[in-house]
Each structure stands twice: as C-alpha cells, then as structure tokens.
Amino acid sequence: MAGYQEERDGSEHSVSILFTRSAGEQAPVTAQLALLPDELGNKTAEIILNGQSLGTIQNFSEEGNAKLSEKQTTELLTALKGNASIEVVFGEFKEKVSDKGAAAAMLKMDEFQQRLNTPSALIRQGQEKHAVLAQQAAPKIEAVSVNNRQTTELKRGEKQFDAVLALLRKSNGTNEDAENYCYELHKDDVWNKQITLYPLTKGKVLAQAICSSSAYNYTNYYAVLDGKLSKVEQVLENRYNYADYDKNTHILKIEGSFKARGLGDCWHGQEAVWNGKTFILTKEYPSGSCKGFPGGAWGPLPTFVSELKVK
C-alpha cells in the first residue's frame, strides 16, 4: 500500500510512504519513505503526525529511500484508520501526504490476506481463529536454452523481407478495430524498415517487427514462424517491445515496458520466456501512481512473479 503527496495548486514535492506486509499470521508491517534525492538537503527528514513529531529519519539510500522504525510504522497505521494529518519535512520543504483512501486500502489488504476479524487485521480486528493466507512459493516456469542465438536482420527491399512481412501482415488481419491490430506493421514508412529473426528451438523462429508507436511508447509485433519462414504458427499479444537472449542461461526473453505518461514517473510492464512450445508469462508489474518520481517511487511493484527452471 503506497501513499503520496497531497494534490494541490502550485508546486508539489514528491513524497511517498510504502507499507508492505507479507502473508502469514505473524507477518509484521514495514514502512519506507521515498523522497527525491535532489530535495533531501542534509539527508534527513521528519514526519509530523497530527501536529506531533515522529522523529528524524536518516540512512537514506542514494535513490532517496529510508526505512521507518517499528514505532513510526505503528503510529502511522493507527492514525490512518481515521483522519490523519501527515507532513514530511525535508531540506527546505514541507509536504503533506494524502490520507484519502488509506483505511479502505488497509481493509483491502486484510481481506486479500484473509485477516478480517482476526487479531492480526489492520482495520477490522476480532478474535476469530481461522487461518490467514499463508506464504506461497512462486510458480515454477520452465524455459529452454537456445543453442543457436545468431539473429538475422531482414531489410526493406530484400526479397525475404517482403515475403516475411506479407506473412506477418496476413497474421495480423485487416480489422483496424481489433485489439491486436498493428497500424505501423501495415504501413510502408520509415518505422517499418526491418524485421529481426530470433532462432528458437525445434527449428522455429521468433519474428520481430514494429507494431505501433506514439510520443513516448512503442510496441513490437512478435510471431513464431516455422524454420522455412513459410507460415506463422503463433502470434503474441501486443504487450512487448524488446527481445534478447540471457547471457548466462541462453533463454530467449521478451519484455514490455511502457510509460503511463511522458514524464516517465509511472510504468507498467511484463516479461515472458520461450518454454519450447510457446512464450509464457513470468513477471507482471505496475510502478504505482504518477507522482513525479522518475521510474516510479518504488520501481516495479510485481503483481505476478515466478521462479525460472532452465532446461
């Protein structure tokens, strides 16, 4: 659960507080504070809760993050159950952190972790003894290493480029209202000037071409072809814009990373790997709200993770 500076007219200085709790009955809640490094001044900050100081925070990382004490965390959580006035003083600045929706977010945390009406709940505490959500191992996903990792670039004007492009366009269809339709793929312009072929296993090939582009994002069109480049066997969702082989495991990974706005302070993305038959999702994440932190206040906040098993 992450909170950010309160929106107001005029200049805002980026502030975020992140509360984290693992699954498990005895799992504690930890909290971190994030500020922009250039605004930290003497590398210390102070939290003012309902007019009272919670003490000085030090030991900020180079990224501008610092862990709060157990006492500071507990007092903030207690106050956020109702109306809380939270101010952070740092350098020459003072910024108010919004408490809107905090109680509802904590209730959602309790509900997801099956803590409602138990002693470990944050909001709706009770004496029920039922089990809460236990920690679970990340799902194991198989990926295969690729022996031949020599990519091929097909250039516009080459006979093979034209043939493969025709296959890709046919596989993408002609319905411009379709969710997976790629406008740039069907245009003969500067964006659509090369196709990259990545060898897979069992004689198959991954083809990469441009799909769409905007002011600050682009997607690629990815399709699995047979080794003779005569037919498209699989088409991937338009969620990716990068492919490469891992230098250590030699697996082929595709990634998608996208800004929510041009400032680049909020992102979302996902990753997938070739398992010998298809590409399977291995990671998915947002980065939180758009609040002025380059890359997001906390970087990727995964909603899905996995453990890779390479064959």
Identify the role of each PLM range.
Residues F161-E184, S287-E307:
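Surface-exposed loop and turn segments in beta-propeller and other repeat-based domains
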Residues I195-S214:
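Exposed beta-strand-loop-beta-strand "reactive/processing" segments of non-cytosolic proteins
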Residues S171-Y183, Y221-L236, V273-I280:
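Surface-exposed loop/turn elements that mediate protein-protein interactions on large endomembrane-trafficking
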Residues E233-K311:
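Short aromatic loop motif centered on NTY/YTY
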Residues G24-E25, N50-Q52, G82-N83, P199-V205, ...:
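Short, solvent-exposed coil/turn segments at beta-strand boundaries
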Residues A215-A223, G264-E271:
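Structural motif
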Residues M1-C182, Q194-L197, T201, L281:
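A generic "folded-domain core" signal
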Residues Y4-Q5, L33, A207-S212, E255-R261:
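Short beta-strand segments that buttress and anchor functional surface loops
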